[in-house]
Regions:
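N-terminal, polar/charged subdomain of small-to-medium soluble alpha/beta proteins
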Residues: 1-110
Length: 110
């Protein structure tokens, strides 16, 4: 995903490439038997929804984007019971930081 995300103005002005990793919890029994996408969650639709959300506005924190991703997924995909999302910045412009900052956030519908 690509987003205008970051605490610093220059991060939001340039925009950032992000990696979004998901673990989706749902009952897969029917999909396993029927082999129909309609009995599961359409992963292409999930991906497009996340891209649209990430590009829809500016974010200061990856924590906020992760929470909004989960909220949006629960609102669009009724079959989801739980979501674990990891959002990772792929390029960091801070000399004092090595690696890729990321957060993982889990929520269940219950």
């Amino acid at each position: 995903a690509y987003s205008k995300l970051g605490v610093f103005d220059y991060e939001r002005e340039l925009g950032q490439s992000l990696l979004v990793d998901l673990e989706l919890e749902l009952d897969l029994e029917e999909a396993g038997l029927s082999d129909k996408v309609s009995d599961s969650v359409d992963y292409a639709a999930v991906s497009l929804a996340i891209r649209g959300l990430a590009q829809s506005k500016e974010y200061l924190l990856i924590e906020h984007l992760a929470r909004e991703i989960i909220t949006m997924l629960f609102s669009k995909f009724d079959k989801l019971e739980g979501v674990l999302v990891e959002v990772k910045k792929t390029i960091v412009n801070a000399q004092q930081f090595s690696g890729e900052p990321s957060i993982r956030l889990y929520r269940s519908r219950l």
